[in-house]
Regions:
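Secretory targeting signatures
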Residues: 1-14
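Intrinsically disordered, low-complexity repeat and linker tracts
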Residues: 12-24
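Acidic, low-complexity Ser/Thr/Gly/Pro-rich repeat segments typical of extracellular/periplasmic
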Residues: 22-262
Length: 262
């Protein structure tokens, strides 16, 4: 009987093939932060297409100009005109894109998701406080390292808390063909999603933000070296002012043409 049941004799073959276990890469994939974005806008701030303002986000390199830049507003950058609102048409000011930088007399502004607390911040009566260490805002000449005196106020006419403009106003016009940096800390506000990603050193899905990651890191370092508290930074951006040639060049050309016709 046992001869008829060979399996009972323990003669089955043993598989001694080596089992190979593949190692799994457990390295976490880099986090990419999703940012609200619109083509033609500065996606550092989702509240308004042109904020913060003015900004290098709307400059492109151009080696034919004095500054090496050219203003680059898209067709949808400016808001819809009140008179053309029914047609949904944006304001078009093509001549601005001929400039080689931002106006030295421009308003400097941004907005946050709630109204900032300006307690202790320089106003029109305490402008000197804006130059003190620890002040919540800084306007810095990035070429000389000099702070620019200013005061801060919100738009008193605003009726939308999330759209309230914060103005940084200067006593004198800025220097032409010069890089400036702005920093805002504290104020009981929160950074935008994009700017928080910059602070955290994270990649975003917004190309215009990614194009400025290095320059913004350098800016944060510069305002920190100037004595600004960057541990509670809520917004920072930079811009380059236009050259005098770009600002008054058209007027000089008109004058020359008029004199030639006399």
């Amino acid at each position: 009987l046992m001869l008829l049941l060979p399996g009972c004799l323990g003669t089955e073959e043993i598989d001694d093939t080596e089992v190979i276990v593949e190692e799994t890469d457990t390295t976490p994939l880099p986090t990419i932060v999703s940012v609200p974005q619109t083509d033609g806008c500065d996606n550092l701030n989702p509240i308004h297409c042109m904020l913060p303002f003015p900004s290098d986000a709307f400059l492109r390199e151009d080696n034919s100009t004095v500054t090496g830049y050219r203003v680059n507003y898209a067709e949808n950058t400016f808001p819809v005109s009140g008179s053309l609102a029914g047609q949904g048409e944006n304001v078009q000011i093509d001549s601005i894109n001929l400039m080689d930088g931002m106006s030295p007399t421009t308003q400097i502004m941004t907005a946050f998701s709630n109204i900032p607390d300006l307690t202790g911040v320089a106003d029109q009566h305490t402008i000197g406080a804006s130059l003190e260490a620890g002040h919540a805002t800084i306007l810095l000449n990035l070429e000389t390292g000099e702070k620019v005196a200013h005061w801060v106020e919100t738009d008193a006419r605003a009726d939308d808390e999330t759209g309230t403009i914060v103005f940084i106003r200067t006593l004198v016009q800025l220097e032409p063909n010069t890089a400036y940096g702005v920093g805002i800390s504290g104020l009981n506000v929160t950074p935008s999603v994009a700017f928080q990603a910059v602070l955290d050193g994270l990649e975003t899905d917004a190309p215009d933000v990614e194009a400025r990651q290095i320059s913004m890191a350098n800016l944060i370092g510069a305002i920190g070296n100037a004595g600004h508290n960057t541990t509670d930074l809520k917004a920072a951006w930079q811009f380059h002012t236009a050259s005098m040639e770009s600002i008054i060049g058209p007027m000089l050309s008109m004058r020359a043409d008029a004199l030639e016709r006399l």
